[in-house]
Curated annotation (Swiss-Prot):
PROSITE patterns: NR_LBD, NUCLEAR_REC_DBD_1, NUCLEAR_REC_DBD_2. InterPro entries: NHR-like_dom_sf, Nucl_hrmn_rcpt_lig-bd, Nuclear_hormone_rcpt_NR3, Znf_hrmn_rcpt, Znf_NHR/GATA. It comes from Rattus norvegicus. This is Mineralocorticoid receptor. The keyword Metal-binding applies.
Length: 981
């Protein structure tokens, strides 16, 4: 029967029920640009052959049996070029034929839709493919036979699907055209390659007429498979192809053509429709080899790099195309039921880098309010592309959100789960905590700091009392000091650890250390810095002497402290010193008397390297020794390229010779200096003299006398009493000698010269330096003769009241020795000139400390005088109510005043002027109280406003100031003056 196509045909899916829900689709065609008007809508002539018995009658089982009998076919004839208007039949005949076909389709759909209507579920899984899969299914649709027309239109209804309209096709055809071809079938099973011979009538495109084609996408279950035009590119014919009167749409004549694929919800009313769940139409689609096509699936070399969704059957023999002609392409990429079931479709040479679905909604989709089609989950499979090259499309990967079972079990273990709120859809591999230091952090447990000394706080194995308070540092009180040999003032020898770089002049060194003594008599020395050391002292020994009630033996103090670098000319470096000699010692014991433990290694006071000895009056390394000698003897005039404050250390000591020479001079190096050997007189004590006459030679038997054994050797008590008396007098150390040996080492401030000098940074550096110096002061007071006789509470009180006085007095001494009182020598790496004094916000106080240093220059103060005066300053401030053991304190202070008087009298240049010098020295001690009062006032102010001023206070100073501040402000502190004001 021959009929004419009509504008709008109802859908074949239960026409009466769905008529109001289906949108109208208009297809327009034209023969040429001049003939196109709004009324010039010609319908194509199609020849339909109704096969009898193709439609079963309400029998689901019968349809299953007849599925193998009916096969669709569509043939295309290229012999004619167009359709004449005289061949158009009446519209009434077309409507009658359409009604007959629709009624037949409706009868079948009523019988099978309840049993096999699963379209919605399969559509959400992405089961859409225009492929040849239903060879065993029943032919349910009438096909148009070849009737000599040039072109025909096949439009099979499928589930609403997203249209693919790439920009390249729009720009090529002059606009965003709507495709006139819809993917003809909906797949629920495995699909195979769609093929069509060249002689078949194509329902998809004609050789010259069709310029744009949309595509659909399918997937087998959860496995994505590309349809003939999966990649989202339109079937585009060359614009230069001549339009030979085809009724197909061209870009210039069909701008308003409604597309079945332009919107997912638009339904083309086609005279032929396939049921959603049973695709019984073979859709052989072919593109003739004479049309230059653009393919996003296969792009062989002879296709002029054009895009096409359908491979040319004659020129695509070696490409794996999504749609292939059976005569040319033997390898179809759309998986057939046999070869490619449950597998990924193989992309062509330009199909992209993986099995990716590019779902791009068309503009029509949003205009018509379509619901989004769920994106199928895809994942990129390694080696899924045989010879793939990334295509020109912007491929979007939708990563699978659910973690794979094998992956999660291998990475996270059996009990690992992914939190639904986790920002990562793919689980992150977590190492087991058995051999991992971070395992505890994953479980929520706090991790232990492997480097506790970097914390900046005080660390100790003792309780808080031991390492935060002065009582812990000073240790428990000892028995009374009565001068006997059995009771010593020093029950515990303080061991100074080898200098391992804690005093290294680096800015990065933390600022504190701690020394403590626990109840067991062990002293702990912690340096909180780049190097952390813990030292345990030796066990207590009996260290006493006979004839001096206030001072311990020399060797004890020599072992307890390292020699001071600046005072090494007055030390007994390298010379043995004898301890006291007990009464029951034998002569052989004297031979074995040594100096005790060997001295620890020293550091160079210039560069911080390991010192090789005392060179030119200063403990330095060999490199600095040679440098200083050559610089002074050669009279070099070095100039600093910076600000004369370069860092001189082991690595950078050769960078700036000017700053290195300046540091050598500040350390006290002098070519004329020679090492003093004050204790050299003790050297001869090691050479033992014959203490007993040799025994008489035995008489020979010839003389007739009987050999008599020698009498018992006299006891030590009787034989060595006279010699021990003289030795003891020779070994009696003077207080000045003891104070010299216990003088603390030089402490570095750790000042960073690279940062700009501000009041906050300078004051914070001074506070950190003061905390370090307080450790040295406590160690010094601990071994001070007579100080351990005082109760522990009195010791703490005296240190709290006098710490500022001791620090400023020591600063004046260093400034006097190193800069001749021209600068304030706080530390080797922190020297204040006039500029820094102004920047520190304490210029007047700095000038006051400098005036004290200038008094040292005027008086030419000696170290012996300085050391005794410093002890008197420790004992110069007491509570207003007195100490707990005031009598012991008064006795100790009186002894040191007498020692100062003796020292002044022994001075060789003070004949006749000793009393005057003693007066001047005591007046200098009185002047320290006025200076310290101003310093404490400034210190307390910065302590209260430390948060606002951004000034740091170490824990040691915080403890001392917290206890001292209320006592001083309440007037409980009482300074002791030598002279009335």
């Amino acid at each position: 029967m021959e009929t004419k196509g009509y504008h709008s045909l109802p859908e074949g899916l239960d026409m009466e029920r769905r008529w109001s829900q289906v949108s109208q689709t208009l297809e327009r065609s034209s023969l040429g640009p001049a003939e196109r008007t709004t009324e010039n809508n010609y319908m194509e002539i199609v020849n339909v052959s109704c096969v009898s018995g193709a439609i079963p009658n309400n029998s689901t089982q019968g349809s299953s049996k007849e599925k193998h009998e009916l096969l669709p076919y569509i043939q295309q004839d290229n012999s004619r070029s167009g359709i004449l208007p005289s061949d158009i039949k009446t519209e009434l005949e077309s409507k009658e034929l359409s009604a007959t076909v629709a009624e037949s389709m409706g009868l079948y759909m009523d019988s099978v839709r309840d049993a096999e209507y699963t379209y919605d579920q399969q559509n959400q899984q992405g089961s859409l493919s225009p492929t040849k899969i239903y060879q065993n299914m029943e032919q349910l649709v009438k096909f148009y036979k070849e009737n000599g027309h040039r072109s025909s239109t096949l439009s099979a209804m499928s589930r609403p699907l997203r249209s693919f309209m790439p920009d390249s096709a729009a720009s090529m055809n002059g606009g965003a055209l709507r495709a006139i071809v819809k993917s003809p079938i909906i797949c629920h099973e495995k699909s195979s390659s769609v093929s069509s011979p060249l002689n078949m009538a194509s329902s998809v495109c004609s050789p010259v007429g069709i310029n744009s084609m949309s595509s659909s996408t399918t997937s087998f279950g959860s496995f994505p498979v590309h349809s003939p035009i999966t990649q989202g590119t339109s079937l585009t014919c060359s614009p230069s192809v001549e339009n030979r009167g085809s009724r197909s749409h061209s870009p210039t004549h069909a701008s308003n053509v409604g597309s079945p694929l332009s919107s997912p919800l638009s339904s083309m009313k086609s005279p032929i429709s396939s049921p959603p769940s049973h695709c019984s139409v073979k859709s052989p689609v072919s593109s003739p080899n004479n049309v230059p096509l653009r393919s996003s699936v296969s792009s062989p070399a002879n296709l002029n790099n054009s895009r096409c969704s359908v491979s040319s059957p004659s020129n695509n023999t070696n490409n794996r195309s999504t749609l292939s002609s059976p005569t040319a392409s033997t390898v179809g990429s759309i998986g057939s039921p046999i070869s490619n079931a449950f597998s990924y479709a193989t992309s062509g040479a330009s199909a992209g880098a993986g099995a990716i679905q590019d779902v791009v909604p068309s503009p029509d989709t949003h205009e018509k309010g379509a619901h989004d089609v769920p994106f199928p989950k895809t994942e990129e499979v390694e080696k899924a592309i045989s010879n793939g090259v990334t295509g020109p499309l912007n491929i979007v990967q939708y990563i699978k959100s659910e973690p794979d079972g094998a992956f999660s079990s291998s990475c996270l273990g059996g009990n690992s789960k992914i939190s639904p709120s986790s920002p990562f859809s793919v689980p992150i591999k977590q190492e087991s905590s058995k051999h991992s230091c971070s395992g505890a952090s994953f479980k929520g447990n706090p991790t232990v700091n492997p480097f506790p000394f970097m914390d900046g706080s005080y660390f100790s194995f003792m309780d808080d009392k031991d390492y935060y308070s002065l009582s812990g540092i000073l240790g428990p009180p000892v028995p009374g000091f009565d001068g006997s040999c059995e009771d010593s003032a020093f029950p515990v020898g303080i061991k100074q650890e080898p200098d391992d770089g804690s005093y290294y002049p680096e800015a990065s060194i933390p600022s504190s250390a701690i020394v403590g003594v626990n109840s067991g008599g062990q002293s702990f020395h912690y340096r909180i810095g780049a190097q952390g050391t813990i030292s345990l002292s030796r066990s207590p020994r009996d260290q006493s002497f006979q004839h001096l009630s206030s001072f311990p033996p020399v060797n004890t103090l020599v072992e307890s402290w390292k020699p001071h670098g600046d005072l090494s000319s007055r030390r007994s470096d390298g010379y043995p010193v004898l301890e006291y000699i007990p009464e029951n010692v034998s002569s052989s014991t004297l031979r074995s008397v040594s100096t005790g433990s060997s001295r620890p290694s020293k550091i160079c006071l210039v560069c911080g390297d390991e010192a090789s000895g005392c060179h030119y009056g200063v403990v330095t390394c060999g490199s600095c020794k040679v440098f200083f000698k050559r610089a002074v003897e050669g009279q070099h005039n070095y100039l600093c390229a910076g600000r004369n404050d370069c860092i001189i250390d082991k690595i950078r000591r050769k960078n700036c010779p000017a700053c290195r020479l300046q540091k050598c001079l500040q350390a006290g190096m002098n070519l004329g200096a020679r090492k003093s050997k004050k204790l050299g007189k003790l050297k001869g004590l090691h050479e033992e003299q014959p203490q007993q006459p040799p025994p008489p030679p035995p008489q020979s038997p010839e003389e007739g006398t009987t050999y008599i054994a020698p009498t018992k050797e006299p006891s030590v008590n009787s034989a060595l009493v006279p010699q021990l008396t003289s030795i003891t007098h020779a070994l009696t150390p003077s207080p000045a000698m003891i104070l010299e040996n216990i003088e603390p080492e030089t402490v570095y401030a750790g000042y960073d010269n690279s940062k700009p000098d501000t009041a906050e940074s300078l004051l914070s550096t001074l506070n950190r330096l003061a905390a370090k110096q307080m450790i040295q002061v406590v160690k010094w007071a601990k071994v001070l003769p007579g100080f351990k006789n005082l109760p522990l509470e009195d010791q703490i009180t005296l240190i709290q009241y006098s710490w500022m006085c001791l620090s400023s007095f020591a600063l004046s001494w260093r400034s006097y020795k190193h800069t001749n009182s021209q600068l304030l020598y706080f530390a080797p790496d922190l020297v204040f000139n006039e500029e820094k004094m102004h920047q520190s916000a304490m210029y007047e106080l700095c000038q006051g400390m400098r005036q004290i240093s200038l008094q040292f220059v005027r008086l030419q103060l000696t170290f012996e005088e300085y050391s005794i005066m410093k002890v008197l300053l420790l004992l110069s401030t007491v509570p207003k109510d007195g100490l707990k053991s005031q009598a012991a304190f008064e006795e100790m202070r009186t002894n040191y005043i007498k020692e100062l008087r003796k020292m002044v009298t022994k001075c060789p240049n003070s004949s006749g002027q000793s009393w005057q010098r003693f007066y001047q020295l005591t007046k200098l001690l009185d002047s320290m109280h006025d200076l310290v009062s101003d310093l404490l006032e400034f210190c307390f102010y910065t302590f209260r406003e430390s948060q606002a001023l951004k000034v740091e206070f170490p824990a040691m100073l915080v403890e001392i100031i917290t206890d001292q501040l209320p006592k001083v402000e309440s007037g409980n502190a009482k300074p002791l003056y030598f002279h009335r004001k």
